[in-house]
Amino acid sequence: MPESLPNELHSAVSLGILLLASLVGGIAADVVRIPKVTAYLLAGMLVGPSVLHAINHEHIQNFEPFTKLAMALVLLELGCRFPLARLRPILKRALWLGVGEMSATFALVTLAIWLFSGNPAMAVLLGALALATAPATTVLVLKESRSEGPVTELASVLVALNNIVAIVSFELLFLVARMLSDETVVSFWSQLGRLTADLGGACLLGMCGGLFIGYFSGLLNRRRWLVMVLAVAILMLGLCETWHLPYMLSFLIAGVMLVNTSESAPDLLSEQEKIAGLLVVVFFAVHGAELQLSAFLTAGLLGGVYITARSAGKLLGANWAARARGEPANVRRYLGNCLLAQAGAAIALATLAAERWPGLGDQLQTIILGSVVFFEIIGPVLIRQSVLQAGEVPLAHAITHNTVT
């Protein structure tokens, strides 16, 4: 019998355990009325290395292609929420609110970390990382809640803005921090040129992908759309990995391009949903299994400072900006809660920092991994409660949410 067979089989068993745990978690979520996203995360954590050790870390890494594909499809759907006719009237509001929320978050996190660590480079980089909001978590909780209204609409736009600004600002600040340290190995302008090329390439790839999907949806029979969307998504993911492009930006742009160039976008999304639902379960179960309770403790004082300062920045910044702009009371009270969840983008950037700058990057990674345990468990609950209290969840859905199916 081949030696690789037991490992391959065990990976499949691990996936089965994750899915069964998620099934039980989803049923429990209906009973206790918590978002299914939280249930899948907790189910993954329970069977993962942090608690029961039913799944080891090596097998979790084998599922990375599934989780990236799930994130890609979620971002494609998020981009499809922004047809220009709908985006124009809300963009001015969202930009003002985004500037207020992100400025407050960056300032509070940077100042707090600087005071407690005395390390300005760590402070500004954590300030940039604090801007990122988990797109998959936020979008899927809003989708599960079937919420509609100003809080939901603004949260969707701000999630996209937060992640774009977080990626760009982190790369720029990381570059400046390295330049000011004694470890400078490349020129500022060459690195800036590389960053510009990466961002431009990601946007161009996303535009091409969105146009391709939209054009060929008009030529192909509907029953072939799912294969076509998956083929393009996987191809785009592969190209992003090959060329080291930020794939989240590519798929967001692809969605925006698709919804503004093709009348088939809503039907394409409904076809995509046939497999996206399963991939989303895998995504959150795997990320739950990756959550390390020990990292939460290892993050220590700086982790607690980061969590407190980021939470205050998101909540107070959104509230102050909404007040200054004269937004409705519901937006002032609840928008900040919808921006607290944090996972994929922040983890990816912190991992990149650890690879490029082992000393400081390792500290950033420890703090982010520890804080993600808090934000990914608390975030979805706050999002659902916020849209519910804002009156944006249909009454019938709010009443029947705890029905076991």
Segments (PLM) and residue ranges:
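Intrinsically disordered, low-complexity non-transmembrane regions of multi-pass membrane transporters
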Residues: 1-9, 154, 183-190, 219-223, ...
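Membrane-interface helix termini and inter-helical loops of multi-pass transporters
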Residues: 2-6, 53-62, 179-196, 291-302, ...
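Structural signature of hydrophobic alpha-helical transmembrane segments
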Residues: 3-18, 59-76, 119-134, 194-205, ...
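Membrane-interface junctions of multi-pass transporters
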Residues: 28-35, 46-93, 217-225, 232-306, ...
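Transmembrane alpha-helices that form the ion-translocation and gating core
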Residues: 28-31, 88-147, 211-212, 297-390
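Alpha-helical transmembrane segments and their lipid-water interface positions
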Residues: 37-43, 52, 68-75, 105-109, ...
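Hydrophobic alpha-helical transmembrane segments in multi-pass integral membrane proteins
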Residues: 54, 107-114, 166-175, 236-248, ...
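Membrane-interface alpha-helices at helix entry/exit sites of multi-pass transporters
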Residues: 147-168, 185-189, 266-270, 330-336, ...
